């Protein structure tokens, strides 16, 4: 039995929300000093990880709009699982690293809300199995979960 498009959309949205909740829980209770301490994830602070997540959503949002219009997604030209984003991440972090913590936390909520609203506007065809829109949504949820795990591992190592 195949699932109805509305059920599929709801499942994808729930997965996104669950992943974001895992991310939020991973840094819940940390002080401003702990959130901005470098070395939490590689050279990055937790704040850096969060602004990195915002930058990913901000990168993906125009493609969700393209897909909603029936246009081609720019990111669809690359294998998102195989591509190395190290140079892109470094360039974006050089621009975003000095943002204040309160702004990063605000943008984390805003970008997620914008992403969820964009997902709600997507036609069912973009959410079908093997469709790029579905992949983009799944990768975004996995991205939150991956970085939540990194933060939790750091907290365990630091006794936080």
Q: Model-predicted segments: where are they?
A:
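Short, contiguous alpha-helical
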Residues: 17, 36-87, 116, 121-160
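A non-catalytic, amphipathic alpha-helix used as a structural packing/dimerization or gating element
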Residues: 15-18, 22, 103-114, 142
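Extreme N-terminal tail/first-helix region
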Residues: 1-18
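Acidic/His metal-coordination segments adjacent to aromatic residues that form catalytic metal sites
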Residues: 4-8, 46, 88-104, 127-133
């Amino acid at each position: 039995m195949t699932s109805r498009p509305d059920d599929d959309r709801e499942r994808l949205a729930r997965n996104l929300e669950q992943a974001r909740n895992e991310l939020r829980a991973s840094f819940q209770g940390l002080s401003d000093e702990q959130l901005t301490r470098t070395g939490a994830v590689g050279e990055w602070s937790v704040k850096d990880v969060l602004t990195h997540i915002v930058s990913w959503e901000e990168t993906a949002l125009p493609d969700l709009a393209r897909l909603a219009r029936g246009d081609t997604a720019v990111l669809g030209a690359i294998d998102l699982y195989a591509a190395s984003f190290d140079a892109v991440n470094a360039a974006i972090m050089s621009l975003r690293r000095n943002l204040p913590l309160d702004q990063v936390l605000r943008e984390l909520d805003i970008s997620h809300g914008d992403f969820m609203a964009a997902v709600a506007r997507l036609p069912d065809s973009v959410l079908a199995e093997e469709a790029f829109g579905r992949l983009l949504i799944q990768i975004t949820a996995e991205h939150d979960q991956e970085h939540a795990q990194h933060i939790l591992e750091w907290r365990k190592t630091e006794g936080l």
